[in-house]
Amino acid sequence: HSANVAALAATAVTQLGGRTLVLTTTLKAMRAIAQALTVHFAKSGALNAKGGSEMGGIEVLLQGQWPKRRLMERFRQGGTEGQRGCVLVASASFWEGFDVPGKALQLVIIDKLPFPPPNDPLVQARTHRLELQGLNPFNDYFVPEAAIALKQGSGRLIRQTSDHGVLVVCDVRLVTKGYGRRIVGALPPMRRLNSEDEWKLALADLPK
């Protein structure tokens, strides 16, 4: 799955010249996607040993590479003239508190629905408590929490009324599972893209 997400991101990043945030639900996926993107742009000649090229190119940024504030500053610069375009791959804390208004961020890609981790002791305790109350932990806890987290992640895209962008959620459960409609319903109003061609046209229509 991570390889497919990276391939989709590489296509979009190339078209947009960066301007992309990839949010993952696990650190393992984050590292795999960042590595795949780095290899892709190195092979395409868009990267050098320092992570970018002097003649444009793409710089792949990774959560933990620098402090969060420095990553945000570098990402913002990626949308300005004379600076390499950036794609940032991140997880955890970057689902909220990542504020990049304007054209520097035009695409957010989310690898999977952000359900709470079932092996987390706090999640297990919450699940047990709901079961004792006769409730369904998945419907009454996991789905609402995923909806909230997805809304937070998608909120990285539009920070002011003049912003334009595209959100991609790489999880078929949004359309194949009944709870997918509940999660989509929690997102801000946006036009839905129903094909790859529509997606590419939407990217092409974004302000340069």
Please state what every model-predicted region is:
Residues 1-208:
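ASCE RecA-like P-loop NTPase motor cores
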